[in-house]
Regions:
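Catalytic-core regions built around general acid/base machinery
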Residues: 22-25, 73-83
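A short alpha/beta connector and helix-capping loop motif
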Residues: 44-60
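N-terminal accessory regions of nucleic-acid-interacting proteins
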Residues: 1-34, 38
């Protein structure tokens, strides 16, 4: 599948219901892979935490703000799905932060 040369703006996700809807849509579409990156404030805080999650499919980009989201379990469900490859770049710190902050396990990882 060729990637589009048109890049629509990323969709901002900041509620539990938006997150659940997005994860349900992604899981239902049965993608081969999703790309994930996290941003943390560990350089500027005594105990760092995930401040932003960037998630991309072949057709759309999403910015997930975990602070206002009361329940991140839908994201954990995606991470646990073994049939979907999760693409990270230098995944070590992302995986540490995801485990530390949300207690989620990530399966089927491709680390660039």
């Amino acid at each position: 599948m060729a990637l589009s040369k048109e890049f629509p703006p990323a969709t901002y996700i900041d509620t539990t219901s938006q997150l659940r809807t997005l994860m349900d849509e992604i899981l239902a579409s049965e993608p081969q892979s999703v790309a994930i990156d996290t941003e943390s404030n560990s350089m500027y805080a005594y105990r760092g935490q995930v401040c932003l999650i960037q998630l991309s499919t072949r057709t759309a980009d999403y910015i997930i703000d975990p602070f206002p989201i009361e329940n991140m379990q839908a994201f954990g469900d995606l991470l646990a799905e073994k049939r979907i490859e999760k693409i990270f770049h230098a995944a070590d710190y992302d995986l540490i932060c995801i485990k530390r902050d949300f207690d989620f396990e990530v399966h089927n990882i491709f680390d660039t």
